[in-house]
Regions:
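Residue-level detector of anion-binding/catalytic polar loops
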Residues: 38, 204, 214
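Local cysteine-cluster metal-coordination motifs and their immediate loop/turn environment
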Residues: 13-16, 66, 70-75, 199-210, ...
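Proteins with a high burden of low-complexity, intrinsically disordered sequence enriched in S/T/G/P/A and R
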Residues: 9-14, 93, 209-210, 215, ...
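Generic secondary-structure signature for well-ordered alpha-helical cores
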Residues: 32, 36-37, 85, 144, ...
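Ferredoxin-like iron-sulfur electron-transfer modules
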Residues: 178-200, 211-238
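Glycine-rich phosphate/diphosphate-binding loops that line cofactor/substrate pockets in enzymes
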Residues: 1-5
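Cofactor-cradling patches in redox/metallo enzymes
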Residues: 8-137
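Ferredoxin-type iron-sulfur electron-transfer modules and their immediate structural context
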Residues: 17-20, 80-82, 101-207
Length: 242
């Protein structure tokens, strides 16, 4: 079977909104008959912990990746990064809705990511449009732009957890229909650092009372104990100068 240049992952909405579910299903159904991409479905990205099989599955994906989720692209990218699913931020042509199109966004002056592999991760916000064709056209554009060879998805499914656990994610329609016996998730609340904007000023670690933040071996700020974060607490984001 020919190798595919791109893997498309749909991260489900945490709600049971029928319009959102319908959009997810239409996208998956279209990708399943597209012989240029692999497609899979995982639970809402924010609710996956480091040991969840959904996280392990995402780590097993080789090559370039398109993530379709109900989050802003920056948030999606850095959620993946903090889980060890790294790559360059792929440029997309989908426009985010903005309250004021004349707002000038300064160039990021952050410390940036580390150990970024030679692949692109394209994060698309499903909230931008309710027409699946908009996203499918963008996926086709990305495929034609990449035109690279990668090893097949199944070749990478090994190790822990067991392959049969990860293979469930390769049957996306059963996941969407609730037929797959997937590991459950619970709603979580924790901060995510955007290292393109973070200047390592340490205001958040100084301000947080709950021991959420720490530093790595390079003395860079990181989220060390995310589940210590108190639900609804916005303190660190408010004190952040960026």
């Amino acid at each position: 079977m020919a190798t595919k240049s791109l893997t498309v992952v749909v991260s489900q909405s945490p709600s049971r909104n029928p319009a959102k579910r319908n959009l997810e299903e239409e996208l998956v159904a279209a990708c399943l008959v597209d012989d240029t991409v692999d497609v899979a479905v995982v639970p809402h990205l924010y609710n996956l912990d480091a040991q969840h099989s959904g996280t392990m599955f995402l780590k097993s994906i080789p090559g370039h990746l398109v993530l379709l989720s109900w989050m802003y692209p920056r948030a999606s990218h850095w959620l993946l990064d903090r889980a060890g699913i790294k790559g360059r931020q792929g440029e997309t042509l989908l426009d985010e809705e903005m309250d004021d199109e004349d707002i000038e966004i300064p160039e990021p002056a952050g410390i940036g990511g580390v150990d970024v592999p030679d692949r692109n991760i394209y994060c698309l916000d499903l909230g931008v449009d309710d027409d699946p064709g908009v996203f499918l056209d963008e996926i086709k554009r990305i495929v034609s732009e990449l035109n690279v060879e990668t090893v097949e998805l199944m070749d990478w499914i090994s190790g822990s957890p067991q392959p049969e656990q990860l293979e469930r994610y390769l049957d996306p329609m059963s996941v969407l229909g609730g037929e797959a016996d997937l590991e459950p998730v619970k709603r979580r609340w924790y901060p995510v650092i955007d290292y393109e904007r973070c200047t390592n000023c340490m205001e958040c670690i100084d301000f947080c009372l709950f021991g959420v933040y720490g530093v790595d071996t390079l003395d860079r700020i990181l989220v060390e104990e995310q589940d210590n974060c108190k639900k609804g607490c916005p303190a660190c984001s408010r004190v952040c100068p960026e």
